[in-house]
Design a protein with these regions (language model features):
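Extracytoplasmic ligand-binding site segments that recognize negatively charged/polar headgroups
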Residues: 40-54, 60-67, 117-119, 123-270, ...
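Extracytoplasmic/periplasmic substrate-binding proteins
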Residues: 269-338
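Mature extracytoplasmic/periplasmic domains
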Residues: 330-431
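Sec-dependent signal peptide cleavage junction
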Residues: 21-33, 494-496
Length: 497
């Protein structure tokens, strides 16, 4: 029994720590005079090119087309712009923990693209190379990031700090979004999908999925536990509401984690599965009627289901939502004071932040870039291209997105005219309205003590628990074991004869 439990615990711990990485690595030898830039990002997170002619995106202020991969385009652009050759060695990771494990085990990268909490962890551990002052020079026409980053995103990166230093000192945003439910409106009502309690709703027993990682499972669970507080008018209307919301949603006190463990065990009994990537396919196939998703994956699921004439909706729970970011950071262990590497890494960020490339990547992965484009209207035109109503449509509504593009939600230059259904579908996932933004909270980096407590909680929730096996199930297992023993014994007896 002890050996069994040890093996089970060891496996579960391996899952949590991500020491079984699934990396796709493109490692090549380069000449001494070529800058070697080692980049590591999420799988399928940069456009790979190979677009067909009918995939060309025609916008008012330009045409977007991905003939070759974004990485190859960058290498060519860098040589044409700076007269130096750079070779990008591109690797992929599946989870933040996998990336961190690789770094811990000695793998070296110059530029990586983790999520917000991992950026905070790497900042706290002093592993990041700060962005140079030149990177923030708005007078440089090639600094596409600082000239084009959304005013809203820029304020979030400036206001959030680790050890007294803002995120923006070390990180440049790439993609951002929220969490919520993708659901089948023919089965689940808008009201039912507007609360995290959907995960516990017995009406949808074994028909809903939740994410199979501790942070994305813990966030909605805390929201369920604190639902009454989060919806209380005095709390919502308080002067420092967002500060209080951030505190409540990052509560790691022992008592709340103990409660979360019990509630997650209840959720485990009600949901169809804990999943990382299969939830989208389960929605499209009809195995499940709702799935907790990151907004980008939600858009993908809605897009794919439409091809089968199945129309799914997006719901953001009324309690709150998780505001998340993926961003580019340079590693000290990779850059090592090499000015050429640092310049190439920052140029890579800028190249991806150029408006036409932003459109390419958004079109490829379905997520929302942190880039609004600044003076370049291409990104806004692309959003209108995707979601704007046709000229002859009569049933339309206005949908403001000025908070993202101009820092002012009432800016008349950034009000889309859309079909009403989009207010509950892809557009609302990619560019949520201000009421959603106001009730969003970033999950913070937890210290070692809190991490240990939370990881142990997750082991208790996700790993096989012998105490939960009923007497009837034990009898069934015993009978099965007995039958197996008889069969094996018979085979051995026959062979000996």
């Amino acid at each position: 029994m002890k050996k069994l439990m040890c093996r089970i615990s060891a496996f579960c711990l391996a899952v949590i720590l991500g020491i079984l990485p699934l990396f796709c690595i493109n490692d090549v030898k380069v000449a001494d005079d070529v800058i070697r830039l080692r980049v590591c990002s999420w799988e399928e997170y940069i456009d790979e090119g190979g677009w067909s002619d009918d995939e060309v995106i025609e916008l008012e202020d330009g045409t977007v087309f991905g003939k070759q991969s974004m990485i190859k385009d960058f290498e060519d652009w860098y040589y044409e712009t700076y007269g130096k050759r750079v070779k990008v060695e591109y690797s992929c990771f599946g989870t933040n923990e996998e990336l961190y494990s690789q770094l811990t085990l000695g793998d070296s990268f110059d530029l990586v693209c983790p999520s917000d909490y991992m950026i905070m962890k790497l900042m706290a551990e002093d592993k990041l190379e700060p962005l140079s002052e030149d990177f923030f020079d708005t007078g440089n026409e090639l600094n596409y990031y600082v000239k084009g980053v959304s005013p809203y995103i820029n304020s979030v990166f400036n206001e959030n700090e680790i050890n007294g230093e803002s995120w923006s000192r070390y990180a440049a945003g790439y993609m951002w979004g929220i969490t919520g439910f993708v659901y089948n409106p023919e089965v689940v009502t808008k009201e039912e999908a507007s609360t995290w309690s959907l995960l516990l709703n017995p009406k949808f027993n074994r028909q809903v999925t939740i994410k199979d990682n501790v942070r994305d499972a813990l966030f909605p669970t805390i929201a369920i536990l604190k639902k009454d507080l989060l919806l209380d008018d005095s709390f919502v209307n308080s002067k420092d509401y967002q500060k209080k919301l951030l505190y409540e949603m990052n509560d790691t006190n022992e008592s709340i984690i103990d409660e979360a463990e019990e509630r997650l065990k209840d959720i485990r009994q009600n949901v169809y599965s804990f999943e990382t990537d299969s939830g989208k396919a389960d929605l499209i196939s009809g195995k499940v009627v709702a799935s907790l998703q990151w907004s980008g994956d939600g858009v993908f699921a809605m897009d794919q289901s439409e091809e089968n004439d199945v129309y799914l909706n997006w719901g953001t729970p009324e309690e709150c939502t998780n505001l998340w970011f993926d961003g580019w950071v340079m590693l000290k262990s990779g850059i090592k004071g090499n000015d050429d590497k640092k310049h190439a890494a920052q140029s890579f960020i800028n190249f991806l932040s150029r408006s036409d490339n932003v459109v390419r990547n958004m079109n490829y992965i379905g997520y929302t870039s942190v880039i609004s484009g600044g003076d370049n209207p291409l990104v806004y035109e692309y959003v209108d291209y995707c979601y704007g109503a046709e000229e002859d449509d009569t049933d339309v509504i206005e949908y403001p997105v000025g908070f993202f593009f101009a820092g002012d939600d009432e800016d008349e230059n950034y009000i889309l005219t859309i079909n009403p259904e989009q207010a509950d579908r892809q557009l609302s996932a990619q560019y949520p309205q201000m009421d959603v933004i106001k009730r969003s909270a970033v999950m913070q980096y937890f210290d070692n003590e809190a991490n240990d407590r939370i990881n142990q909680m997750w082991i208790n929730v996700r790993c096989f628990n012998l105490n939960r096996i009923s007497a009837k199930q034990w009898r069934t297992l015993g009978i099965a074991a007995g039958v197996a023993a008889v069969i094996i014994g018979g085979i051995i007896f026959i062979k000996r004869r």
